[in-house]
Amino acid sequence: MALTQERKNEIIKAYARHEGDTGSAEVQIAVLTADINELNTHMAAHKHDFHSQRGLMKKIGSRRNLLRYLRNTDIQRYRELIQRLGLRR
């Protein structure tokens, strides 16, 4: 259910701004998006798993806050990221 370390490392490499970057807003948002996508598939199969639903809502809130921060600080990076992740259709 959770992201494997290998998958998380792939995401970090794909979205890192420089070598060793694990904490930039882009990386954090990409990792949260992958977690959210996995939880969405889990919730489709287990509709009454309210503990996982609460975790999903917390992750969505964290991603929303990071996206708001990125939009307010650097709109160009924000637009590129949402396009790469397929958010905001």
From Swiss-Prot:
Function: One of the primary rRNA binding proteins, it binds directly to 16S rRNA where it helps nucleate assembly of the platform of the 30S subunit by binding and bridging several RNA helices of the 16S rRNA. Forms an intersubunit bridge (bridge B4) with the 23S rRNA of the 50S subunit in the ribosome.
Chain's gene name: rpsO
InterPro entries: Ribosomal_uS15, Ribosomal_uS15_bac-type, uS15_NS1_RNA-bd_sf
Taxon lineage: Bacteria, Bacillati, Bacillota, Bacilli, Lactobacillales
GO terms classed as biological process: translation
PROSITE patterns: RIBOSOMAL_S15
This protein's UniProt keywords: Ribonucleoprotein, Ribosomal protein, RNA-binding, rRNA-binding
One example GO MF annotation: structural constituent of ribosome
Family recorded in the similarity comment: Belongs to the universal ribosomal protein uS15 family.
Name this protein carries in UniProt: Small ribosomal subunit protein uS15
A GO cellular component entry from the record: cytosolic small ribosomal subunit
Subunit-structure text: Part of the 30S ribosomal subunit. Forms a bridge to the 50S subunit in the 70S ribosome, contacting the 23S rRNA.
Domain of life of the source: Bacteria
